[in-house]
């Protein structure tokens, strides 16, 4: 166990000025970060079920990549009992466990040096639709993770969650208007100003804007639940053939955009469709285990924003959520077809979904820079 309660060195320049860029998720990784789930007003049974699931995710990742887990001091002993022995526990305080959104975006340069971008965070909407209050501890998470690796830190003047962006490492950034242009994120910035900041801090050239994300996604439609890059020039889209499903017009609109765009290198996109699980709904028993607090209520009968697109690429494997016996095998086979050189590892992930996200949301990769 280590302690990361010290800030990282802050830079005054911007990554693009310094020759740094955000690499694609399939670039070599030196580590993956996760955070311990414990909020009783978001995770049933004070996180017990989620903790067991996070341990399985960490174990699946650990076969390919070292795993670090941020854990508040009060839960370290408990985490040591639950987590696989290969997971490095780091004392980091947090309001919740979404490492993708509160962790840093690590950027690299041609020499393999790594630095981190620390974005502003307001719990997915602040006082205008945010998911909990306060979020002060979450705002400190990225700097503490960067300190653990000895990386210098860029502080970006933009409210942004890691799950709201995907890049191909070759100049293209994909996102959703539903999230990035939402009035509860950066109300004083125009689309053009947001793009300019993303150019500065991700060093990207071209943007693919999808209008909306997955139906009932409480993050305001994060791209990482809806669509991702598989490799340069190829994307994977969350899809349903059911035209009566509320998800259909969202996926169809996204498909129309993807079919009529090119990436930063001028390539037309090859589009893979990944089937929607379910639809899935929160049960009475599952909702009863969540206590009242400042978090979003977990209501019986509420539709869950389940998506197989919410997977992690980590070195030689794909760790993806098992969500529905009717479609899990189909999703696994499609992923194997898309990633023939990767090992496809499914982890039962309903407990993560009940808390509002999935495997990609609870992980944040640290690229090797090589």
Swiss-Prot record:
InterPro entries: Agmatine_deiminase, Peptidyl-Arg-deiminase_porph. The active site is at 361 (amidino-cysteine intermediate). One of its GO terms (molecular function) is protein-arginine deiminase activity. Keywords: Hydrolase. Its EC number is 3.5.3.12. It catalyses: agmatine + H2O = N-carbamoylputrescine + NH4(+). One of its GO terms (biological process) is putrescine biosynthetic process. It is an enzyme of class 3 (hydrolase). It holds the Pfam family PAD_porph. Belongs to the agmatine deiminase family. This is Putative agmatine deiminase.
């Amino acid at each position: 166990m280590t302690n990361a309660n010290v800030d990282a060195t802050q830079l005054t320049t911007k990554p693009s000025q310094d020759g740094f860029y955000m690499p694609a998720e399939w670039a070599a990784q030196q580590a993956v970060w996760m955070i311990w789930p414990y909020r009783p007003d978001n995770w049933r049974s004070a996180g017990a079920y989620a903790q067991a699931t996070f341990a399985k995710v960490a174990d699946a990742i650990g076969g390919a990549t070292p795993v670090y887990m941020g854990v508040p001091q009060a839960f370290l002993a408990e985490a040591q009992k639950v987590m696989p022995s290969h997971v490095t526990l780091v004392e980091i305080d947090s309001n919740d466990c979404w490492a993708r959104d509160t962790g840093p975006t690590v950027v690299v340069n041609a020499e393999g040096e790594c630095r981190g971008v620390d974005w502003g965070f307001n719990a997915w909407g602040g006082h205008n639709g945010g998911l909990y209050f306060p979020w002060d501890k979450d705002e400190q998470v990225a700097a503490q993770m960067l300190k653990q690796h000895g990386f210098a830190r860029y502080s970006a003047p933009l409210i942004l969650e890691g799950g709201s962006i995907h890049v191909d490492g070759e100049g293209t950034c994909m996102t959703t208007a539903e999230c990035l242009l939402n009035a509860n994120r950066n109300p004083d910035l125009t689309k053009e100003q947001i793009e300019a900041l993303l150019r500065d801090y991700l060093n990207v050239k071209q943007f693919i804007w999808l209008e909306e994300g997955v139906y009932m996604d409480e993050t305001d439609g994060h791209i990482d639940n809806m669509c991702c890059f598989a490799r340069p020039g190829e994307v994977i889209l969350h899809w349903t053939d059911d035209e009566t499903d509320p998800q259909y017009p969202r996926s169809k609109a996204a498909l129309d955009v993807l079919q009529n765009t090119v990436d930063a290198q001028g390539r037309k996109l090859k589009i893979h469709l990944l089937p929607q699980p379910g639809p899935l709904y929160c049960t009475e028993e599952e909702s009863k285990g969540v206590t009242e607090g400042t978090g979003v209520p977990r209501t019986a009968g509420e539709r869950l924003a389940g998506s197989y697109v919410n997977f992690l690429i980590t070195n030689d494997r794909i760790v993806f959520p098992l969500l529905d016996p009717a479609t899990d095998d189909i999703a696994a086979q499609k992923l194997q077809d898309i990633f023939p050189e990767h090992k496809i590892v499914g982890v039962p992930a309903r407990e993560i979904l009940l808390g509002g996200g999935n495997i990609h949301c609870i992980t944040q990769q640290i690229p090797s820079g090589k």
